């Protein structure tokens, strides 16, 4: 059966893996997922990720989760824009997460980026998810 929300599935795998204190989780690979993971890594929410290719043309992303003193660095991770209800914002209305302690990840014409980068580049876009 086809997956209706691949990005939402990846975020759920990360949330569940962190709740179970897993060292890593895996998810099917896609360009959008890899770009979101790049932002999560740059912002310090995951240790890193690697892409593993299989012989049948399929690939998987292995995500290394990050912990601080035994607790997950990610307290909350939520999908904002969903397949049935897309959420677009201008640069002036980019939401702040936890009064600036968390980040919002956006898909913009200039690529996938965190909220503070979008404000610096003066660009809005689709709000993919929020992390705290």
From Swiss-Prot:
InterPro entries given in the database record: Ribosomal_uS8 (IPR000630), Ribosomal_uS8_CS (IPR047863), Ribosomal_uS8_sf (IPR035987)
Molecular function as annotated in GO: rRNA binding; structural constituent of ribosome
Record flagged with keyword Membrane: no
GO biological process: translation
Classification via Pfam families: Ribosomal_S8
The keyword Ribonucleoprotein is annotated on this UniProt entry: yes
Lineage top rank: taxon: Bacteria
PROSITE patterns: RIBOSOMAL_S8 (PS00053)
Keywords, alphabetical: Ribonucleoprotein, Ribosomal protein, RNA-binding, rRNA-binding
Subunit structure: Part of the 30S ribosomal subunit. Contacts proteins S5 and S12.
PANTHER family attached to this UniProt entry: 40S RIBOSOMAL PROTEIN S15A (PTHR11758)
Family the UniProt entry places it in: Belongs to the universal ribosomal protein uS8 family.
Physiological role: One of the primary rRNA binding proteins, it binds directly to 16S rRNA central domain where it helps coordinate assembly of the platform of the 30S subunit.
Name the record gives this protein: Small ribosomal subunit protein uS8
């Amino acid at each position: 059966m086809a997956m209706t929300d691949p990005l939402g599935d990846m975020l759920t795998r990360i949330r569940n893996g962190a709740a179970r204190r897993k060292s890593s989780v895996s998810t099917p690979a896609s360009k959008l997922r890899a770009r979101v993971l790049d932002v999560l890594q740059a912002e310090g929410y995951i240790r890193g990720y690697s892409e593993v290719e299989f012989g049948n043309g399929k690939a998987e992303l292995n995500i290394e989760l990050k912990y601080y003193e035994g607790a997950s660095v990610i307290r909350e991770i939520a999908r904002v824009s969903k397949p049935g209800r897309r959420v677009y914002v201008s640069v002036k209305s980019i939401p702040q997460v936890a009064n600036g302690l968390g980040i919002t990840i956006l898909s913009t014409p200039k690529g996938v980026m965190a909220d503070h980068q979008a404000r610096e580049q003066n660009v809005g876009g689709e709000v993919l998810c929020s992390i705290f």
